[in-house]
């Protein structure tokens, strides 16, 4: 029997697919929709210290090759999501979950993580170090000194399972430098990648979204090659205890297969989930299993990370 089961840290999942933070995760109702689908798990909307309305609309647009957005981290506040996943966990009848959070300053991040540390929540936390769409706030993970200081500080008090959502890197030296930092800490996972920041899509001489004069994060087909490169680069550089979640350009079983081939333990779907809805998880799972059967693979471990190079 072909299995797409996988593991992140000590958490086991019966499938390798889930939503990406930002899609089908703003409200409890949306999260329950994902929970009831064939997704292995869900990740919440990135929760900040306070409720945020986000950037002015229109702030999202589908395009021929994917999407562009400048959402600006709209969310109901981290407490809303923390209380929800904590309540689900208490029932003992739900999948393991991911709680996505970030502060708009180091102090806010510390306040949020200490609150989670003091709570009953024992699931995974995804610390978002890569949102490109908050005006005046740079992507943290592009500043290696700040990233190192942040991780060094948080692991002095935070002992629950935690991973980080990364922006795309484009330079081999940056892969080396980032991995050297991440390998110093007990991270459960890294998520590669968030949208490619500050793209521009034009239609009939006009930009598609309002914030930042049309500049926004690019998702979908545009970013799959970059996402695959980041997944594989970190798979080759990170210690085995740090799992990799692949995100970017996944809309078919073949896309998911390629992320796993590059080293991903789980795969998140964003733009295509927004376009198709939670039924996408059933379709992509079937397509992935069909590929595995055709190639004689029984489990993800049979091919994870086994990308072949040209002689």
From Swiss-Prot:
Assigned EC number: 1.3.98.1
Residues at which FMN binds: 45-46, 128, 165, 193, 220, 248-249, 270-271
Binding site for substrate: 45, 69-73, 128, 194-195
Pathway the protein takes part in: Pyrimidine metabolism; UMP biosynthesis via de novo pathway
InterPro entries reported for this sequence: Aldolase_TIM, DHO_dehydrogenase, DHOD_1A, Dihydroorotate_DH_1, Dihydroorotate_DH_1_2, Dihydroorotate_DH_cat, Dihydroorotate_DH_CS
Organism (species): Streptococcus pyogenes serotype M5 (strain Manfredo)
Catalysis: reaction(s): (S)-dihydroorotate + fumarate = orotate + succinate
Residues at the active site: 131 (nucleophile)
Subunit details: Homodimer.
Record's GO cellular component terms: cytoplasm
Subcellular compartments: Cytoplasm
One biological process term in Gene Ontology: 'de novo' pyrimidine nucleobase biosynthetic process
Highest taxon of the lineage: Bacteria
GO molecular function, one term: dihydroorotate dehydrogenase (fumarate) activity
Protein name: Putative dihydroorotate dehydrogenase A (fumarate)
């Amino acid at each position: 029997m072909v299995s797409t089961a996988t593991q992140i840290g000590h958490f086991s999942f019966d499938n390798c697919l889930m939503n990406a933070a930002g899609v089908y995760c703003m409200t409890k109702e949306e999260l329950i929709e994902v929970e009831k689908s064939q997704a292995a798990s869900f990740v919440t909307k990135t929760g900040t210290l306070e409720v945020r309305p986000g950037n002015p609309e229109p702030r999202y647009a589908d395009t021929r090759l994917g999407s562009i957005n400048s959402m600006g981290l709209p969310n109901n506040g981290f407490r809303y999501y923390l209380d929800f996943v904590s309540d689900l966990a208490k029932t003992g009848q739900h999948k393991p979950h991911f709680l996505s959070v970030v502060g708009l300053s180091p102090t806010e991040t510390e306040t949020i993580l200490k609150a989670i540390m003091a709570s009953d929540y024992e699931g995974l936390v995804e610390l978002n170090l890569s949102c490109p769409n908050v005006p005046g706030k740079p992507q943290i993970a592009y500043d290696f000194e700040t990233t190192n200081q942040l991780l060094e500080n948080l692991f002095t008090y935070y002992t629950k399972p935690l991973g980080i959502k990364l922006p795309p890197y484009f330079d081999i030296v940056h892969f080396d430098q980032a991995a050297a930092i991440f390998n110093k800490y007990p991270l459960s996972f890294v998520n590669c990648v968030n949208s490619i920041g500050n793209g521009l899509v034009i239609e009939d001489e006009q930009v598609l979204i309002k914030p930042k004069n049309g500049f926004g994060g690019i998702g979908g087909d545009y970013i799959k090659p970059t996402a695959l490169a980041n997944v594989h680069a970190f798979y080759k550089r990170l210690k085995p205890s740090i799992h990799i979640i692949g995100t970017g350009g996944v809309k078919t079983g073949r896309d998911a297969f390629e992320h796993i081939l590059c080293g991903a333990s789980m795969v998140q779907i964003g733009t295509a989930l927004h376009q198709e809805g939670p039924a996408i998880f059933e379709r992509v799972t079937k397509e992935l299993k069909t590929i595995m059967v055709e190639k004689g693979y029984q489990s993800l471990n049979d091919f994870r990370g086994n990308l072949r190079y040209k002689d």
